[in-house]
Curated annotation (Swiss-Prot):
Bias kind Basic and acidic residues: ranges: 350-365, 656-671
Entry's family note: Belongs to the AIM44 family.
Native source species: Saccharomyces cerevisiae (strain JAY291)
Main location: other
Sorted UniProt keywords: Phosphoprotein
Localization (cell): Bud neck
UniProt biased composition (Polar residues): 338-349, 366-383
Residue runs in coiled coils: none
Phosphoserine, modified sites: S25
Record's compositionally biased regions (Low complexity): 315-330
The protein, known as: Altered inheritance of mitochondria protein 44
Region Disordered, residue ranges: 55-77, 314-383, 602-674
Domain of life of the source: Eukaryota
Length: 724
């Protein structure tokens, strides 16, 4: 049996087995709305860690703020302590210096001395209780009183006396030190330039009684100047590296004076540290000074622009009581509205950097944050990129509240009064069966529990595991399958009435089983007999009707183009613009009138077949519009005969149509039109098509397209215009 165990059981972040620590389950969390403090688990980590080991306050590897870069378990860094991803130095504490030893004096301060030089480091003994064994690491010694990252002077080769402010920070013992909120108030400005900084002596002398007394005095001075650091991190940790300008000038003087003692000192310096001084130090200090000045300017401008008077601004509790009194008494509604407006206008925007000054208790641990000041980690995590966080925290297309409750296939039940909100992934209100995401089509993205990202950690918001119902997306309904009876095409309207009464062409499969086979055979025989009789007549009628229709349309279009061509011709324009004696109007006016009357008519006044029927039956009386149309057609026929003789005056379109032979056969077709007088009586042009989707009881179950001839008009752009 294979037992799964982590490969690396010890990490620096927990100082113990990984399996000892368990994240608190979501069942222990309150069910109400959770703030960011409760969703964040930094304080839980620190409490568990502090309960297991008593740890010094300022040790940086313990906190989870910079866990990716400062932990030695991280394999992606260059050295064990990668100095938080910034400039890394050569680690000279490996093989060049001798191992330090710890001396504990009577006045309860431990001194770290190296045998090679008379260099001594002092650190407070309250960090190491007497009961525990001294877990000494070179980083904890320096960090206890180095509250800001000290820049290393260029030529500083250890003087005989070095205080806590002037040590050699290496990559092992000092990565960037995180200054707490009280770090700015740790060092008073007056005392740093004189008493806190001791000049380094030029000559290294052996330790005498006088030097020992001086050392004790310097220890007392340092302990009096540097107070104990406060224990809480109440704001965003900042990286402080450089002090005031006086301090930097004195640092340079001490570094220059210590060059003479370089021959007597046995400590080796690597070239990687020498590059830290000089221009790099100058520009970093200059940049920090400029930032401080800009922040002061910003504060001054804010105070003047946004009226920073604290006395005028009423507190939150007073405003709440005044609002409640106004609501209860209902006497001073106007005053209440004025107070609300004043509160909203005069309250300044608070900066999170200057907000967090709270009374602090000694029992609180490092890194435990209050709900008012959330910790923000600026180092990007190696395990989490932006895309992975988006992938893990996205609830596909929309949040769980977006799926409607009345949907049968939705696996999340939602109240009905859901506002149709527009979320990042779904612009439309999602009515789909499965909640899908636009970018990914993976199977694991179909349904995922809602989650939130706090400090680059994905925290699920529910313990429910939604099960996906196994349903087919493409449902085949067997009730919609129907057996189709044989399709029969019938053209006569008389038979349509008989067939609709006697036999339903598209009966349901269940209904047709009840009908006997004898009835089916009889119906089929009747249908075949009727079809045989009607096919001959219907074929002849449809042929004659379509021939008559197309010939008249083609003839009228040719006549119209002849008229337009002659009007556009300059030579014959004078003749045709003169008024004719018969109609007392020009040909151009007749053409315009004929066009207008046809388009204004509703299909009754200017019909193609009516004009043809007048030639067959001269006895019928017609309107004036129809007579004008007939006269135009007779004139245009004569003009077309003349046009056949004069080919030079015609357009290209007329020549193409003559090549096809339409102009030659036009006279014959006009003569045949007189023989089609019975066509006028039958006024329906029916194209019969049968489909299985036709309605059973409708009048149009016989044919999809039914065209009465009165609806068909002549068009200038299209060959035929129809209303279906």
């Amino acid at each position: 049996m294979i037992i799964r165990a982590p490969i690396r059981t010890k990490t620096k972040s927990f100082r113990g087995d990984q399996m000892d620590f368990k994240f608190p389950s979501n069942e222990s969390l309150p069910r109400g709305t959770l703030e960011e403090y409760h969703l964040n688990n930094h304080h839980l980590l620190n409490d568990v860690f502090a309960a297991e080991n008593g740890v010094s306050r300022d040790e940086d590897g313990n906190s989870q703020i910079l866990s990716d870069y400062t932990s030695t378990s991280n394999t992606n860094t260059n050295s064990g302590y990668s100095s938080n991803g910034y400039y890394s130095f050569a680690n000279i504490s490996d093989n060049t210096t001798s191992s330090p030893r710890i001396v504990i004096n009577q006045n309860e301060t431990a001194r770290l001395t190296s045998s090679d030089s008379n260099k001594s480091d002092f650190f407070a003994s309250h960090d190491f209780p007497g009961n525990d064994s001294l877990h000494y690491s070179s980083s904890s010694v320096v960090k206890n009183q180095l509250h800001s990252m000290e820049a290393i002077p260029e030529g500083n080769i250890t003087g005989s006396i070095s205080t806590a402010f002037q040590t050699i920070p290496t990559a092992d013992n000092v990565s960037y030190d995180i200054a707490p909120s009280s770090a700015s108030s740790l060092l008073p400005r007056k005392s740093t330039s004189k008493s806190a900084i001791l000049p380094s002596t030029q000559e290294a002398k052996p330790m005498t009684k006088l030097n020992m007394e001086k050392d004790i005095k310097t220890i007392e001075l340092n302990n009096s100047v540097v107070p104990k650091p406060k224990k809480k991190l109440n704001r965003v940790p900042t990286i402080r590296r450089v002090e005031s300008s006086r301090f930097s000038n004195s640092r340079y003087s001490s570094s220059v004076s210590s060059k003479s003692s370089s021959s007597r000192c046995s400590l080796k310096r690597s070239k990687a540290i020498r590059c830290k001084g000089g221009l790099l130090y100058y520009f970093t200090s200059l940049g920090i000074k400029i930032k401080k000045k800009l922040r002061k300017l910003r504060l001054v401008l804010r105070r003047r622009l946004f009226s920073y008077n604290v006395q005028k601004v009423p507190s939150a509790t007073n405003s709440k009581t005044t609002k409640s009194k106004a609501n209860i008494n209902n006497k001073s509604k106007k005053r209440g509205t004025n107070l609300v407006n004043k509160n909203s206008n005069s309250t300044p925007r608070l900066d999170t950097k200057f907000k967090a000054n709270h009374p602090q208790s000694e029992d609180s641990k490092v890194g435990s944050n209050t709900p008012r000041s959330p910790l923000v980690s600026y180092t990007p995590s190696l395990r989490r990129t932006n895309s992975s966080i988006r992938r893990a925290a996205s609830i596909l297309t929309a949040s769980a509240t977006m799926t409607p409750a009345n949907n049968k296939n939705s696996f999340i039940s939602v109240p009905d009064n859901v506002s149709h909100a527009v979320t990042r992934n779904s612009s439309m209100y999602s009515r789909s069966r499965l909640v899908r995401s636009k970018p990914s089509t993976a199977l694991n993205a179909i349904a995922r529990q809602p989650s939130i990202v706090v400090e680059n950690k994905v925290i699920p918001l529910s313990m429910n595991r939604y099960s996906i119902k196994e349903e087919d997306e493409y449902v085949i309904d067997t009730s919609s399958m129907r057996e189709l009876s044989p399709v029969n095409s019938v053209c006569s309207s008389d038979y349509d009435r008989e067939s609709s009464e006697s036999y339903s062409n598209y009966a349901d499969a269940m209904e047709t089983t009840e009908v006997d086979n004898k009835d089916r055979v009889e119906c089929n025989n009747e249908i075949q007999n009727v079809n045989a009789n009607n096919e001959e007549t219907s074929n002849e009628e449809s042929y004659n009707l379509m021939k008559h229709y197309l010939s008249t349309v083609i003839a009228q279009r040719i006549m119209l183009r002849v008229q337009i061509a002659r009007i556009q011709n300059n030579k014959s324009n004078v003749v045709y613009m003169n008024k004719s004696a018969e109609t007392n109007s020009t040909i151009y006016e007749d053409l315009a009138d004929s066009l207008l009357t046809e388009y204004e008519a509703d299909g009754s006044s200017s019909q193609i077949f009516d004009g043809v029927s007048v030639r067959a039956d001269e006895e019928e009386e017609e309107d004036e519009d129809d007579e004008d149309d007939e006269e135009e057609e007779e004139e245009n026929d004569d003009e077309e005969d003349e046009e056949d003789e004069e080919d030079d005056e015609d357009d290209e379109e007329e020549e193409e149509k003559r090549k096809e032979g339409e102009g030659r056969n036009l006279a014959k077709e006009v003569d045949e039109l007189a023989e089609l007088s019975p066509m006028r009586k039958q006024s329906d042009l029916s194209i019969t098509l049968r489909s299985p989707f036709a309605m059973l009881n409708s009048a149009y179950s016989n044919s999809i397209i039914s065209l009465p001839t009165g609806v068909v008009k002549r068009s200038l752009t299209l060959p035929v215009g129809m209303k279906i």
